[in-house]
Amino acid sequence: MAGFLRDTADAWEAKIDDWLYVTDGAWARDAGASGYYIRVAPPVAGEARAATHAMVEVRNRDLCNADIPADALVSTDTLALVRFGLRAPDDPRIVDSVRVIDHVLRQELPTGPGWRRYNGDGYGEHADGSPFNGTGIGRVWPLLAGERAHYELLAGRKAEATRLLAVMEASGS
């Protein structure tokens, strides 16, 4: 059983780029990157890359805007590929993905940089301040500064990781 699971994990790892890396997305052009990892691709029969252009339902968005093209959905989840040892922090695909993440999701706050989970996130209160009821507006998550600090540390940038730790601490209430 262990061999089967190891072989399956190796096969999946070998397909990550086919399943989730796009080189023709608008965000790459906008950020000056060669490509980026997308948040999720729906199961599509046939060619794996076809899924990167399929529609994905984001359930915490209002029904009129719930569907978004997979290649338009950028997420900080990409950093997990480095944290889990599946990609090196200096892998050009990771470096370009971080460039896109910063272009799309980074927001400068009084405490320092912050990141939203993904573009179009609807988890949060509404624009008028009313509470989340299944849809809303996604905001910056202080915890994501800590996740970015992990990446910076693995990339050998201890000073930046320490700065991001201070950003996360300053964001607490």
For the regions a protein language model found, what residue spans apply to each?
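Extended ligand-binding clefts on enzyme/binding-domain cores
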Residues: 2-142, 156
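C-terminal hydrophobic structural anchor segments
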Residues: 129-173
